[in-house]
Curated annotation (Swiss-Prot):
It holds the Pfam family Hamartin. It comes from Homo sapiens. Changing residue 411 to I: In TSC1; uncertain significance; no effect on expression; no effect on subcellular localization; no effect on inhibition of TORC1 signaling. Phosphorylation at Ser-505 does not affect interaction with TSC2. Changing residue 962 to A: Abolished interaction with TBC1D7. Changing residue 158 to C: In a bladder tumor; somatic mutation; reduced stability; does not affect interaction with TSC2. Highly expressed in skeletal muscle, followed by heart, brain, placenta, pancreas, lung, liver and kidney. Also expressed in embryonic kidney cells. Component of the TSC-TBC complex (also named Rhebulator complex), composed of 2 molecules of TSC1, 2 molecules of TSC2 and 1 molecule of TBC1D7. Probably forms a complex composed of chaperones HSP90 and HSP70, co-chaperones STIP1/HOP, CDC37, PPP5C, PTGES3/p23, TSC1 and client protein TSC2. Forms a complex composed of chaperones HSP90 and HSP70, co-chaperones CDC37, PPP5C, TSC1 and client protein TSC2, CDK4, AKT, RAF1 and NR3C1; this complex does not contain co-chaperones STIP1/HOP and PTGES3/p23. The gene is TSC1. This is Hamartin. One of its GO terms (molecular function) is ATPase inhibitor activity. One of its GO terms (biological process) is synapse organization. Changing residue 61 to R: In TSC1; uncertain significance; reduced expression; altered subcellular localization; reduced inhibition of TORC1 signaling. It comes from the Eukaryota. The lineage of its organism: Eukaryota, Metazoa, Chordata, Craniata, Vertebrata. There is a cross-link at residue 30 (Glycyl lysine isopeptide (Lys-Gly) (interchain with G-Cter in ubiquitin)).
């Protein structure tokens, strides 16, 4: 809501009378549009414009950029569908597209175009239809490719509106149809120029029906009389003219010019590409003037005798002078005004209506407008001057006003100064003879001595060389003679041709009824005295020798009547008859005209004045008399071409201006603002609305004319640039020709020097030949010497190769010897390692033998104690036996598993040995391959092998050193543990001996106490022992890391699996609880002895066979063997004694670890 309120405040400030505030608000709107991409702001501006017709809002909307173009087109499309806002929104659309925004190509795909076409098909409001048609005509050159989708819609609109021009509905005012007819005429030109094949096909099919035949005869056929045959009708086809590739090379102004080229109507036609109007045409038509006291040569600029087209119009020349004063640019005899040939200039309605305040314009106004225009063309002060460049090569004028401004400067009525002498009019050049005459208060004419003329002569550089001075003087005399002959002729006014009726006939004839002539004559009689009418000579001027050849059929002007204006005709009447032929923006005093009928001289007429100058003079006089007779006698018999709808519109505007000025003249001067209606009082509302609609239609038509003029100016600027480039290229070519001449001179000089050099070269060649023969003989001698030296070098080379081969063989033998030495060193190190392992095994074996002796003594001691026990312990013994049996079964299963593991380990050993053999074989092959490679690599491989052997020896020494250190650490730890266990066992034995002296009752009590105590003692170190065993196994990874590096076998605890770990746990606990001070060595025939030997032998053999086993692995095997032997020593202890003695408390305390429940708990 705050944003909407802010936008409302900005809109209120948009039409502020303060220019600074208005500019700031406009800048804020543009910034918001750049930052906000939503449609809200655009919709608000469109609504505001429709409500207020604000010009700042219109300026913002016409300068919108992407992506707001879609929002604008959508909003316009929305309002086009509403009848109340259709007219104003179409006017907004016209303003937008006339500026040709960068997104104009999107119009063909926007939904607005179908809506516009639908509106033109369905709407019945003439103002809306006329505005829409002008918008469509303006839009078509921008989106020519849209014809492929909407071509039939364009044709339907033309058919509908052309029928309206004839069969008008009852609710439509007749005056509106003039504007509609002019719009339909422009649409006809656009469709015929862009799509001729399809359009002619439509006309053929549509107007072949009987109901449309009258429309064709009255409306369409007169339009077709004003166009040429389009070249596409001969060379093109329907599909070709709709092909998008046809339009890719054309811009908007190119399309407009292409459409104008095929028009014969001077208001629509273009005179480019070598086309020039024939000099005879202007003799058939009247020329307009602005005052009755004119000189007979005041309107020579209206002749069609000029051939080339300048890129700008005199209507854009602004003369800065005050009323009542004659500007220096007009009075100076050395001044030449920039002008345009009449075929490129149009009569402006603002000249007739008296509009002195045209709309403002954007564009840059040149700072200096009062300088003489002769400076632009480089003319001199006297008579005829040669400009520096043709109008085609002169720079384009800066836009003095807005493109729709029709500059009008009212000159005060003062005394006329007739021309000082007859100036030659060369119809092949764009010349302008202007005499600006000032009328005095009485309207009298000054004496002829004060005549002055201003001449603009174009440079004929692109047309040919100038005629000689004598020919020019002779032609001036002939021209003066013709002018004097014509000045003696007085003509009477011919009877006018009465038209069919009012505006119901769109193409009525050129002349007006006699009553209208009389009315205009009476109305103009109060403005000044009349002068004797003098005919114009410019239309019969001779064509120069450099007249360009006509490229097209000349344009037949639409008002070629034989009527004459009476001597007292006022300005508006003369302008009414020749409305489209006055190029000047100023009101110039008009001459009375002489019509020469519709007859034309033959096209070869101008050749006579070149070949036979004197004969041509008499021929022109005779031809003039014949034309005058024909004009007097056969005025009504001549067929007058139909009037263009544009001229009809111009005449309507002129008649409105006449009526307005007539009513104002009836009123006294102080009351010019009084209501001008015929009956007095306020005009009716319908008349006000009609006038407002007419004003709107006229404004739309002027905007369309502005658009056309913009396109022509753009085209002219392009052509001007091309002409400037052509002139520059010609100058460049001339400079290149001069350079070519200089270079040819240089070439001649170089040729002479070349001959001298060739002679010198021949001498040098002879000298060179003699020198070459001498050098050849020397070369042959040197080649012979070189061959001898080459043979000697070959012999030395062969000797060198033999020496190199011997050295290579000796190096190979040396490498083999080194390999053998390294191999023997490796074998020696392995043997030394095995020897050290065997020594450590022997030491372990001695230690185990000692342990076995100790355990045997302990066993005998236990047997004696059991024999000495009472017989009351039978139940306990039975339970223990049962437990021992179960434990024996478990141990047997463990033994079986151990044997299975042993078998698998043996198989694994065999597999590893086979792998080792394969590896040895591969190593041998690789050694052979390496030897071959060494032969090729030579020095580099030898150095690499030496480094490799040295590194290998170092790593072997380091590994042996590391393994030795790990073995020492493990031995030291094991010895310390054994010493601690021996000390504990000795203390326990002494305690048990003390307890044996007590009684039976005391022994039972002590037995229970010690059992509980030993349970606590054995349970407490159990976690530590478990931690120690697991730590030795887990941390044994660190101690046995070297063995893992040297052999691929897994550690013993990883190979054994869960059974081995459980076995080691139980054995570790059992060995920890068994005293080591008592017992004897088991016999070799007992189960324990055999099992111990088998295990020891297997372990030792596998340890000796595995080359990669280290000392840490041997130590781990020793500890496991000790544990196994400790457990197996207990098993036959219980089995060999079939008559156990009653256990002592010490024995009970020592055997509690074998309890079934406890062992079962530990295994679980």
């Amino acid at each position: 809501m705050a944003q909407q309120a802010n936008v409302g405040e900005l809109l209120a400030m948009l039409d502020s009378p303060m220019l600074g505030v208005r500019d700031d608000v406009t800048a804020v709107f543009k910034e918001n549009l750049n930052s906000d991409r939503g449609p809200m702001l655009v919709n608000t501006l469109v609504d505001y414009y429709l409500e207020t017709s604000s010009q700042p809002a219109l300026h913002i909307l016409t300068t919108l950029q992407e992506p707001h173009d879609k929002h604008l087109l959508d909003r316009i499309n929305e309002y086009v569908g509403k009848a109340a806002t259709r007219l104003s929104i179409l006017s907004l659309l016209g303003h937008v597209i006339r500026l040709q925004p960068s997104w104009k190509h999107k119009l063909s795909q926007a939904p607005l175009l179908p809506s516009l076409l639908k509106c033109l098909k369905m709407d019945t409001d003439v103002v809306v239809l006329t505005t829409g048609v002008l918008v469509l005509i303006t839009m078509l050159p921008m989106i020519p490719q849209s014809g492929k989708q909407h071509l039939l819609d364009f044709f339907d609109i033309f058919g509908r509106l052309s029928s309206w021009c004839l069969k008008k509905p009852g609710h439509v005012a007749e005056v509106y149809l003039v504007h509609l007819h002019a719009s339909v005429y422009a649409l006809f030109h656009r469709l015929y120029g862009m799509y001729p094949c399809n359009f002619v096909s439509f006309l053929r099919s549509h107007y072949s029906m009987k109901e449309n035949l009258e429309t064709f005869e009255e409306v369409v056929k007169p339009m077709m009389e004003h166009v040429r045959i389009h070249p596409e009708l001969v060379t093109g086809s329907k599909d070709h003219e709709l092909d998008p590739r046809r339009w890719k090379r054309l811009e908007t102004h190119d399309v407009v010019i292409e459409c104008a080229k095929i028009s014969l109507d001077p208001t629509e036609a273009s005179y480019e590409d070598g086309y020039s109007v024939s000099h005879q045409i202007s003799a058939r038509f009247p020329h307009r003037s602005a005052d009755v006291t004119t000189s007979p040569y005041a309107d020579t600029q209206n002749s069609y005798g000029c051939a080339t087209s300048t890129p700008y119009s005199t209507s854009r020349l602004m003369l800065l002078n005050m009323p009542g004063q004659l500007p220096q640019t007009l009075s100076s005899p050395s001044t030449r005004l920039i002008t345009e040939p009449p075929q490129a200039t149009l009569w402006s309605p603002s000249m007739v209506c008296g509009m002195t305040t045209p709309p403002t314009s954007p564009g840059n106004v040149p700072p200096d407008l009062s300088h003489p225009y002769s400076k632009v063309f480089g003319t001199t002060a006297g008579g005829k001057g040669t400009p520096l460049g043709t109008p085609a090569t002169s720079p384009p004028p800066a836009p003095l006003c807005h493109s729709d401004d029709y500059v009008h400067i009212s000159l005060p009525q003062a005394t006329v100064t007739p021309p000082r002498k007859e100036e030659r009019m060369d119809s092949a050049r764009p010349c302008l003879h202007r005499q600006h005459h000032l009328l005095n208060d009485r309207g009298s004419e000054e004496p002829p001595g004060s005549k002055g003329s201003v001449t603009l002569s174009d440079l004929p550089g692109f047309l040919g060389d100038l005629a000689s001075e004598e020919d020019s003087i002779e032609k001036d005399k002939e021209e003066a003679a013709i002018s004097r002959e014509l000045s003696e002729i007085t003509t009477a006014e011919a009877e006018p041709v009465v038209p069919r009726g009012g505006f119901d006939s769109p193409f009525y004839r050129d002349s007006l009824p006699g009553s209208q002539r009389k009315t205009h004559s009476a109305a103009s009689s109060s403005q000044g005295a009349s002068v004797n009418p003098e005919p114009l000579h410019s239309s019969l001027d001779k064509l120069g020798p450099d007249t360009p050849k006509q490229a097209f059929t000349p344009i037949d002007l639409p008002c070629g009547s034989a009527d004459e204006s009476p001597a007292g005709d006022r300005e508006c009447q003369t302008s009414l008859e020749t409305s489209i032929f006055t190029p000047s923006p100023c009101k110039i005093p008009p001459p009375t005209r002489v019509g020469f009928g519709s007859g034309q001289p033959p096209p070869y007429d101008h050749l006579f004045e070149v070949a036979l100058p004197k004969t041509a003079h008499h021929f022109v006089i005779r031809k003039t008399e014949e034309l005058l007779k024909k004009a007097k006698g056969n005025t009504e018999e001549d067929g007058v071409p139909s009037t263009s709808p544009m001229e009809v519109l111009d005449r309507l505007i002129q008649q409105g201006a006449d009526a307005h000025s007539k009513e104002l003249n009836k009123l006294p001067l102080p009351s010019k603002s009084v209501d001008w209606t015929h009956f007095g009082g306020s005009p009716p509302s319908d008349e006000i609305r009609t006038l407002r609609d007419q004003l709107l239609l006229l404004h739309n038509q002027l905007l369309y004319e502005r658009f056309k003029r913009q396109q022509h100016a753009l085209r002219n600027r392009r052509l001007l640039r091309k002409v400037i480039k052509a002139a520059a290229l010609e100058e460049h070519n001339a400079a290149m020709k001069d350079q070519l001449k200089l270079q040819e001179k240089d070439i001649q000089m170089w040729k002479v020097s070349l001959q001298k050099e060739q002679a010198r070269y021949n001498q040098l060649q002879e000298q060179r030949d003699t020198m070459v023969t001498k050098l050849h003989s020397q070369i042959r001698q040197l080649q012979h010497d070189r061959e001898e030296f080459y043979n000697q070098s070959q012999e030395l080379q062969t000797k060198l190769e033999d020496c190199r081969n011997m050295i290579a063989e000796l190096r190979i033998e040396l490498k083999k010897a080194n390999n053998k030495v390294c191999h023997t060193e490796l074998l020696l190190s392995q043997v030394s390692q095995k020897l050290s392992n065997s020594e450590s095994v022997q030491q372990q074996m001695e230690f185990l033998n000692r342990q076995l002796l100790v355990l045997g003594e302990v066993n005998e001691l236990y047997l004696e104690q059991l024999q000495n026990k009472h017989s009351d312990t039978t139940k306990e013994v039975e339970m223990m036996k049962a437990a021992y049996r179960k434990e024996l079964e478990k141990n047997r299963s463990h033994v079986l598993q151990q044997t299975q593991r042993l078998d698998t380990s043996q198989k694994r050993i065999l597999e590893l040995e086979s792998h080792l053999a394969k590896k040895d074989h591969l190593l041998l092959e690789q050694k052979k391959y390496l030897e071959d490679v060494k032969l090729q690599a030579r020095g580099q491989l030898q150095a690499a092998e030496s480094r490799y052997e040295a590194q290998k020896r170092i790593t072997q020494v380091f590994e042996l050193e590391i393994l030795d250190l790990y073995g020492r650490l493990e031995k030291d730890g094991l010895l310390k543990k054994l010493e601690e266990e021996k000390a504990e066992a000795a203390e326990a034995a002494e305690e048990r001996l003390d307890c044996c002296n007590d009684g039976c009752s005391d022994s039972m009590v002590g037995h229970n106490e010690e059992a509980s105590g030993h349970n606590g003692e054995t349970k407490t170190p159990r976690p530590s022992s478990a931690r120690g065993s697991s730590g030795s196994r887990g941390g044994g990874g660190s101690s046995s890391s070297s063995s893992e590096l040297s052999t691929p076998e897994k550690p013993p605890h990883q190979r054994a699996g869960p059974f081995s770990s459980r076995w080691e746990t139980t054995m570790g606990e059992a060995s920890a609880s068994i005293p080591t001070t008592v017992g004897s060595l088991p016999s070799s025939k007992s189960f324990l002895g055999m099992k111990a030997r088998e295990l020891f032998r297997n372990k030792s053999e596998s340890q000796c066979d595995e080359d990669g086993m280290t000392s840490s692995l041997s130590e781990s095997l020793k500890t496991e063997l000790g544990k196994d032997l400790g457990v197996e020593a207990k098993i036959p202890l219980n089995l060999d004694g079939p008559h156990p003695s009653p256990p002592t408390p010490d024995s009970v305390g020592q055997l509690h670890i074998m309890d079934y429940n406890e062992t079962h708990h530990e295994h679980s």
